[in-house]
Regions:
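Non-heme di-metal
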Residues: 2-324
Length: 324
């Protein structure tokens, strides 16, 4: 929708408080649209409860976990742990966005609705992992305690526009990660569960993406700078997970989430929707940010080409060894 600017003067006048107020109507419209298309679903319906067995501890018939019990592939197990631990930090994410967006009006209603929907993801993933014995339950809990005990601080907590820009890309990145994890898991039950979660993440992305588009109509220079900063410095919210760098490298090789996927399936779709390189009428700082964004995307694509070549060479070596 087109927003009438309140003509507050220079970009410096656009404080977070004024932007929140100016975008309130957009948030309300997007919230109403979201509620019409979002479908409620029951996490327990996606869990293979009949596969469950007691673990050792308080039950005499408890059976210790063993890697061979899992139907999930190795890369699927790695990605599932990273994805679940990322979802587990929901209390910190809620605190971040509630503090920034507020708890009143349409903003507050969205914050609480988003939190409630996201809460399903951690519930169903943990139930699936434990019931199907896909992961070591003791290590999973140790990872959860370690990760959540560190807390979470968003890189973009200083700015409402940066935060909106970040979640527009991050929600899509999370959707893609869940979807690809399902494809690589080797278990149709897991794939179906993660497809359901990915549907939620996509709707969340659409909400923030549309909000970001509206922000461009109000404060194009500031929004362009925010998008530039977020894209150039992007990192997933689970970056603080113990062993994240090694897991991320394995997920890249396993084609769950890597540089090519990040460029083609996450950054480009949002930037194309915003027609980011076609926006004109920008001031000097906005133009500079737009140019730097274009240069960064070109550089990222070139790096992705190198990654693709290395990955193809690795696959060829592995195929040769398998055929030997």
């Amino acid at each position: 929708m087109t927003i009438a600017s309140p003509h507050l003067g220079s970009p410096a006048v656009w404080t977070d408080a004024r932007l929140l107020h100016a975008l309130e109507e957009v948030v309300e419209n997007e919230l109403n649209r979201h509620l019409k298309v979002a479908k409620d679903w029951m996490p327990h319906e996606y869990v293979p409860w009949s596969d469950g067995r007691n673990f050792p501890g308080l039950f005499e018939d408890g059976e210790a976990w063993d890697k061979e019990q899992s139907k999930v592939t190795e890369i699927g197990r790695i990605a599932l742990i990273v994805n679940l631990l990322t979802e587990d930090n929901l209390p910190s994410y809620h605190h971040e966005i509630a503090s920034l967006f507020g708890r009143d009006g349409a903003w507050g209603t969205w914050v609480h609705r988003w939190t409630a929907e996201e809460g399903r993801h951690g519930i169903v993933m943990r139930d699936y992992l434990l019931t199907s014995r896909a992961v070591d339950p003791d290590k999973l809990e140790q990872f959860r305690m370690s990760h959540m005990s560190e807390g979470f601080e968003s890189d973009n907590r200083h700015s409402m526009l940066h935060s909106v820009a970040y979640v527009a890309f991050q929600e899509l990145a999370t959707r893609i990660s869940h979807r690809n994890t399902g494809h690589q898991s080797g278990d149709p039950v897991c794939d179906r569960m993660l497809a359901r979660i990915a549907t939620d993440e996509n709707l969340h992305m659409i909400f923030y993406r549309n909000l970001l588009k509206a922000a461009f109509e109000l404060a194009p220079d500031l929004t362009m700078q925010a998008v530039r900063d977020v894209v150039v410095n992007f990192r997933m919210p689970g970056h603080g997970i113990p062993g994240f760098e090694r897991a991320a490298a394995q997920m890249a090789i396993g084609e769950v989430y890597n540089m090519r996927i990040h460029h083609d399936d996450v950054l480009q779709p949002v930037l194309r929707f915003l027609k980011i390189m076609e926006i004109d009428g920008l001031g000097p700082e906005g133009q500079k940010a737009q140019e730097e964004l274009g240069l960064y995307m070109g550089g990222l694509d070139a790096e992705a080409v190198k990654f693709d070549e290395k990955l193809a060479a690795r696959k060829a070596r592995m195929a040769a060894r398998a055929g030997a």
